[in-house]
Design a protein with these regions (language model features):
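Catalytic activation segment of kinase domains across protein kinase-like and atypical kinase folds
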Residues: 191-223, 227-230
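Conserved NTP-binding catalytic cores of kinases and kinase-like/nucleotidyltransferase enzymes
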Residues: 1-86, 180, 194-204, 314-331
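Residue immediately N-terminal to the catalytic "proton-acceptor" Asp
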Residues: 184, 189
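Secondary-structure capping and boundary motifs in well-ordered enzyme cores
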Residues: 140, 178, 183, 212-213, ...
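Active-site activation/catalytic loop segments of kinase-like enzymes and analogous catalytic loops
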Residues: 146-155, 216-250, 264-281, 293-301
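ATP-binding pocket architecture of kinase catalytic cores
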Residues: 33-143, 147, 153-154, 176
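ATP/Mg2+ or Mg2+-diphosphate-binding catalytic cores
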Residues: 272-331
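An alpha-helical support segment within catalytic cores of ATP-dependent transferases
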Residues: 5, 9, 14, 126-135, ...
């Protein structure tokens, strides 16, 4: 039986000049996208298979062009078929931060480069012709925070509205101005070391197609409160200080409050998403990270601005009932 997707892929590779080259699967992510490496004569490229309607490669192409225009390292798009959902991309290799850190690489040096890249991104003047990006506004942030009570701990409609009302009251304090470009998944799985490139161009950027404009602290929180690995407290503090030193106009107290709220919102979202990936998509591998995400969330909730959320969770999802999404049922 013929596989229409395989046939479409073969036609795309033929048109791009890579016909007949073996496509070796690469590690995937939590999306519907799949990746393959193709190599010949000492060179290689990466094929992104992003099947519509679940995926749309248009934002990836636009954001990649923007990042490259800003002097940062995003993969060059070598060929594209937007209708079929195929991209042929520059191959950045295998030196992801995740892999390097697991192999004992210099952790402070890698995080310093990542923070410097984030600073450069936020300092760069937006060039003309930038794509119109969605705003990371209140409704979008609420829609993510509610994933906790939609998937991890389903609650009756009245409690759901109560939870949302608390977030509506708190989130305005997270919206520090001016808004900036937010990549949203800025963490070690999506950063790759390019040692032959100077300065911040040595930090390759991946998985940025969901970029938005939003609060400046979001990507720093994403980097330093990583759902997949523990980061030493002193390193977190040093990297936060490095970031804040680059933006002396930011009021530190205001930023600290914003960052705590964004971190808690993000961790509520992650708990919901990891549970959804298991319950809906059969991807159990993300459940191993849930205890760490709860630890991060509980630390975030120590900020006074998050007291109402902390008290709500203590009532409806007390500490002894956490870390086990398989035991959650509707309250």
């Amino acid at each position: 039986m013929h596989d229409p997707r395989r046939q479409a892929m073969a036609a795309f590779l033929d048109a791009a000049g890579w016909a007949g080259v073996r496509a070796a699967p690469l590690a995937g992510d939590a999306s519907f996208r799949r990746y393959y490496r193709l190599g010949r004569n000492g060179s290689s490229v990466v094929l992104m298979d992003a099947p519509p309607p679940q995926e749309d490669i248009g934002p990836y192409v636009a954001i990649a062009a923007l990042l490259r225009e800003l002097g940062l390292s995003a993969p060059e798009v070598l060929a594209e078929d937007r209708e079929q959902g195929f991209l042929l991309l520059e191959d950045f290799g295998d030196d992801t931060y995740t892999r390097l850190l697991a192999g004992g690489a210099d952790e402070p040096a890698l995080y310093t480069l990542a923070v410097d890249t984030l600073i450069a991104l936020q300092c760069a003047a937006t060039p003309r012709g930038t794509p119109e990006l969605p705003s990371y506004d209140m409704e979008r942030l609420l829609g993510e925070a509610v994933l906790l009570v939609d998937w991890y701990r389903p609650v009756a409609s009245g409690l759901r509205e109560e939870y949302l009302a608390l977030w509506r009251a708190i989130l305005p304090d997270a919206m520090v101005s001016p808004p900036t470009l937010v990549l949203r998944d800025y963490h070690v799985d999506n950063l790759i070391l390019l040692p032959n490139r100077p300065g911040v161009r040595g930090c390759g950027l991946l998985d940025f197609q969901d970029a938005v404009t939003g609060p400046p602290g979001y990507d720093l929180v994403s980097l330093l409160e990583d759902a997949r690995r523990d980061i030493p407290g002193p390193l977190q503090q040093a990297m936060t200080e490095r970031y804040l030193t680059a933006f002396p106009a930011l009021d530190r107290s205001t930023f600290s409050r914003s960052a705590a709220i964004l971190a808690a919102q993000r961790n509520c979202k992650i708990l919901g998403i990891f549970t959804r990936l298991w319950k809906r998509d059969g991807k159990r591998q993300y459940l191993v990270h849930i205890p760490r995400v709860w630890r991060l969330l509980e630390a975030d909730l120590g900020h006074p601005a998050l007291g109402p959320i902390a008290r709500w969770l203590d009532r409806h999802l007390p500490p002894e009932a956490r870390c086990r999404p398989d035991l959650q049922s509707e309250a």
